[in-house]
């Protein structure tokens, strides 16, 4: 991967924030989360299929991952407000954002172990795909305002 390709990936992070913010406002935080996690699932499966030395697919997959990373910075506050309401937003968003950071730490550890155990980072995408599926299920079942109504609906 070239330096230019690597430097271009954070652009997708920046685009993901307003894009998924718009989706969360226009559709719902739940729908935005399901779309985001579906992209993560698709990119994880693409990386498992591609293996190593497939630069074009690697760049495409990581552009998708960066898009979704930025997207969560818009989805998480919207989902927190939808689920807990604004009266309890600050306290609950702190917990949600802590979990986001914890996931980043654990993801790095899991990726490192995958490299150590299998000699490649490719297998780090197995738990990523599984967790994306779990996240989709959780979003569909639980990401709704208590009482069953989406905010603004």
Task: State the predicted function of each range.
Residues 71-84:
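Intracellular juxtamembrane helix-capping segments at the cytosolic ends
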Residues 26-37:
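Cytoplasmic membrane-interface "Motif A"-like loop-to-helix N-cap segments
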Residues 57-71:
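Hydrophobic core of transmembrane alpha-helices in multi-pass small-molecule transporters
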Residues 81-90, 119:
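Paired intracellular helix-loop junctions of major facilitator superfamily
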Residues 39-52:
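C-terminal ends and interior cores of transmembrane alpha-helices
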Residues 123-141:
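Symmetry-related core transmembrane helices of the 12-TM Major Facilitator Superfamily/SLC fold
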Residues 23-24, 110-119:
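Interfacial helix-cap and linker-helix signal at transmembrane-aqueous boundaries
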Residues 2-9:
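Short, small-residue-biased leader/transition segments that mark boundaries at the very start
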């Amino acid at each position: 991967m070239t330096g230019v390709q690597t430097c271009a990936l954070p652009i997708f992070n920046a685009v993901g924030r307003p894009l998924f913010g718009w989706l969360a406002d226009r559709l719902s935080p739940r729908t935005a989360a399901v779309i985001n996690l579906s992209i993560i699932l698709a990119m994880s499966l693409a990386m498992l299929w591609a293996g190593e030395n497939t630069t074009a697919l690697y760049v495409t997959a990581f552009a998708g991952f960066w898009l979704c990373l930025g997207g969560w910075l818009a989805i998480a506050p919207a989902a927190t407000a939808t689920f807990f309401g604004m009266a309890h937003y600050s306290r609950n968003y702190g917990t949600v954002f802590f979990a986001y950071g914890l996931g980043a730490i654990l993801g790095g550890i899991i990726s490192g172990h995958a490299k150590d155990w299998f000699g490649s980072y490719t297998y780090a995408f197995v738990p990523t795909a599984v967790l994306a599926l779990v996240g989709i299920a959780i979003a569909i079942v639980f990401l709704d305002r208590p009482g069953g109504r989406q905010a603004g609906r």
